[in-house]
From Swiss-Prot:
Organism: Oryza sativa subsp. japonica (Rice)
Keywords per UniProt: ATP-binding, Ligase, Magnesium, Nucleotide-binding, Phenylpropanoid metabolism
Role description: Involved in the phenylpropanoid metabolism by mediating the activation of a number of hydroxycinnamates for the biosynthesis of monolignols and other phenolic secondary metabolites. Catalyzes the formation of CoA esters of cinnamate, 4-coumarate, caffeate and ferulate. Is more efficient with substrates in the following order: ferulate > 4-coumarate > caffeate > cinnamate. Possesses very high activity compared to 4CL1, 4CL2, 4CL4 and 4CL5. Cannot convert sinapate to its corresponding CoA ester. May play a role in the synthesis of lignin as well as other phenolic compounds.
Binding annotation for CoA: K259, K442, G443
Family, as annotated: Belongs to the ATP-dependent AMP-binding enzyme family.
Keyword ATP-binding: yes
Residues that coordinate or bind ATP: S188, S189, G190, T191, T192, K196, Q330, G331, T335, D419, R434, K525
Region (SBD1), start-end ranges: 261-330
Tissue spec: Expressed in root exodermis and epidermis cells, stem vascular cells, leaf developing vascular bundle cells and parenchyma cells, lemma, palea, stamens and pistil.
Further remark: Plants silencing 4CL3 exhibit significant lignin reduction, reduced plant height, decreased panicle fertility and abnormal anther development.
One example GO MF annotation: CoA-ligase activity
Protein encoded by which gene: 4CL3
The protein's name: 4-coumarate--CoA ligase 3
């Protein structure tokens, strides 16, 4: 459909026509709308245990989970924390909370206790649903706040087993839920700063899923005959939205993996004839480079969705040699955007030819524009600028943070992504840089400000700055520039260990460079571009070596 000019603003739209989206219903009503057709079909399969649940059983489990959570005091407007790896109980709990008009805040079970406590406190969690590997991380918070803890994989002192939650009678009727009520509360660092609660409503998630899988020619063609691999963590919005919710809406079968293991992945693909494989580039790298994986192993896969981080042409070519029967394409998203901004049109029921390196075209029923990051002026085709998106799929705002919301969504409803890219003559979007400070380690967000705030609590660190450094396997890794206090001889290894005790594995500092000062502008903001330029020039290694040999100073 190309671009249209309105008040000198160049607006880009999908090549696919807009569709009618009924986002006046609740998310669970939307996901189970085809129950009469798919009720007896397999819905969720636990890849680890082999246990299978039909659509009717999943819907019933969500009603029982709702009743059980209500008995624990959860009601409309409350928040349930899901601190889980992928498992069927994640879906039961999420959908159950939705029926009560409650929201689920998703968190990584490998977070440190400090990270878990901070999110649970900020979100106002009323109940925490977790598992054995994380239960000890929540005990102190739960005891202090009187928050019940539910465990999905066994009995633990002071905790409620999830099977007890499911023992409740089915909820007779859902709560009176408004489309603009919050249903998901993932945490994101946005374009800068510490993690913030992203308020995604029933309306926004329905709109986002519909933009992908609804319509006569859906952008993302899932069918009830497809078997989707759910390997990417459901606590990440990409997997929750484009795998679980999109799969439920389409009536597909979803095979759940708790963690990535290449051998187990191949076994599940063969056993269940997996047809849809949502991956991130680090998984693609491992498959491409593994001599153990053959084209025969992965022959059933017809579609590989890659999101969360860019992927180059050389990697694509090596990977496709292993999955010759599949279409490979990329999407582009941001938690605050609902999360999908763009999707590869090669995934459509009636596919389009796409270019390598593109992250797709803007989703239907949405508008996208490119603006000059300095002036805000709207830019045309093939001109790089900040990507902005508008539509009913974007977040309601940040929880309890109107200032951050105002800085992200402008008065005209445009969400500013902080990503730099352009739209070419064929409406395909290319990402070229990032305005925002967030580091992407294997698709996971690493906010520099969080690490900097932690680093300067060390008595031997006077100042610190964290930036990204390119890495072949991870995409990016966090590295720290450190100014020591006068007389300090703190080492790189000591700093790494100090950070590692407080943060999840992917936020750990990869390398430390000692320096005399951190470059800042007159207002005190760290000049990260200057530090990245030093990395690109190879200067930090010399600085680090000199610092190791020289007397320590401030």
């Amino acid at each position: 459909m190309g671009s249209v000019a309105a008040e000198e603003v160049v607006v880009f739209r999908s090549k696919l026509p807009d569709i009618e989206i009924d986002n006046s219903m609740t998310l669970q009503e939307y996901c189970f709308a085809r129950m009469a057709e798919v009720g007896a079909r397999p819905c969720l399969i636990d890849g680890q245990t082999g246990e299978s649940y039909t659509y009717a059983e999943v819907e019933s489990a969500s009603r029982r989970a709702a009743a059980g959570l209500r008995r624990m005091g959860v009601g409309k407007g409350d928040v349930v924390m899901s601190l889980l790896r992928n498992c069927p109980e994640f879906a039961f709990s999420f959908l159950g909370a939705a029926r009560l008009g409650a929201a689920t805040t998703t968190a990584n079970p490998f977070y440190t206790p400090h990270e878990v406590h901070r999110q649970a406190e900020a979100a106002g969690a009323r109940v925490i649903v977790t598992e054995a590997c994380a239960v000890e991380k929540v005990r102190e918070f739960a005891a202090e706040r009187g928050v019940p803890v539910v465990t999905v994989d066994g009995a633990f002192d002071g905790c409620v087993e999830f099977r007890e939650v499911l023992a409740a009678e089915e909820l007779d009727a859902d709560a009176d839920v408004h489309p603009d009520d919050v249903v998901a509360l993932p945490y994101s660092s946005g374009t800068t700063g510490l993690p913030k609660g992203v308020m995604l409503t029933h309306r926004s998630l329905i709109t986002s899923v519909a933009q992908q899988v609804d319509g006569e020619n859906p952008n993302l063609y899932f069918s009830k005959d497809d078997v989707i691999l759910c390997l990417l963590p459901l606590f990440h919005i990409y997997s929750l939205n484009s795998v679980l919710l999109a799969g439920l809406r389409a009536g597909s079968t979803i095979v759940i993996m708790r963690k990535f293991d290449l051998g187990a992945l191949v076994d599940l693909v063969r056993k269940h004839n997996i047809t849809i494989a949502p991956f991130v580039p680090p998984i693609v790298v491992e498959i491409a480079k593994s001599p153990r994986v053959t084209a025969e192993d992965l022959a059933s896969i017809r579609m590989v969705m890659s999101g969360a981080a860019p992927m180059g042409k050389d990697l694509q070519d090596a990977f496709m040699a292993k999955i010759p029967n599949a279409v490979l394409g990329q999407g582009y998203g941001m938690t605050e955007a609902g999360p999908v901004l763009a999707m590869c049109l090669a995934f459509a029921k009636e596919p389009f030819k796409v270019k390598s390196g593109s992250c797709g075209t803007v989703v239907r029923n949405a508008e996208l524009k490119i603006v000059d990051p300095d002036t805000g002026t709207s830019l045309g085709r093939n001109q790089s600028g900040e990507i902005c998106i508008r539509g009913e799929q974007i977040m309601k705002g940040y929880l309890n943070d109107p200032e951050a919301t105002k800085n992200t969504i402008d008065e005209d409803g445009w969400l500013h992504t902080g990503d730099i890219g352009f739209v070419d003559d064929d409406d395909e979007i290319f990402i070229v840089d990032r305005l925002k400070e967030i580091i992407k380690y294997k698709g996971f967000q690493v906010p520099p400000a969080e690490l900097e705030a932690l680093l300067i609590t060390h008595p031997e660190i006077k100042d610190a700055a964290v930036v990204s450094m390119k890495d072949d396997l991870a995409g990016e890794v966090p590295v720290a520039f450190i100014v020591r206090t006068e007389g300090s001889e703190i080492t790189e290894d000591e700093i790494k260990k100090f950070v590692a005790k407080e943060v999840v594995f992917y936020k750990r500092i990869n390398k430390v460079f000692f320096t005399d000062s951190i470059p800042k502008n007159p207002s005190g903001k760290i000049l990260r571009k200057d530090l990245r330029a030093r990395l690109a020039a190879g200067i930090p290694d010399a600085v680090a070596a000199a610092a190791a040999d020289a007397p320590k100073s401030s």
